[in-house]
Amino acid sequence: MNADSAQLEVLKSVLNSFSLATRLQINFHKSSMYPINVEASVAFALAVQFGCQLGSMPFTYLGLPVGTTRPKIIDLLPLVDCMERRLTASSWFLPQGNKLQLVNSMISSLPIFFLCSLSLPQGILKQLERIQRQCLWRKYGQEKGHSLAAWPLGCRPKMKGGLGILNLGLQNDALLLKYLNKFHNKADVPWVRLVWDSYYF
């Protein structure tokens, strides 16, 4: 919506009506306003009028960094931290087959939501790949494990002599291509209809 005082009052009135109808109390003090291309003084005045906090881009929504530009590496470090926390010391004592199962079933599946939504920088993909390799090859007492096979070979399907480990870079590209497929085929999805109706009518 536009940075307009009157529209803001209408929005607050709608939210208050929703609160009265559903008995769900809205806590405006815990809400945040994220202005885009709005002067700081105007944004601050609107936030005071609405009774909420004034946020800034990028912000986190459902764990994803949301902003008007491509996320930087520092914005995606929480994903790396999350995967490293799952790389517990107990995995060092597992047999090699169990480590492979751990990599395929848990470590490689953690970033799927990010891979579906964002084009991850190569720096982040390399760090995630490092965590996969550590989980698979590192043994107790070692800071880093010595790879017993080249990583591209490990990422091949098992029927082609590989270990079936998910290549996160290729997975990222494949998951993002589904949006292009939906757009090209004019899928019955709100965002597809909006773009086609707005720019390609």
Per-region residue spans from a language model:
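Nucleotidyl polymerases of mobile genetic elements and RNA viruses
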Residues: 1-201
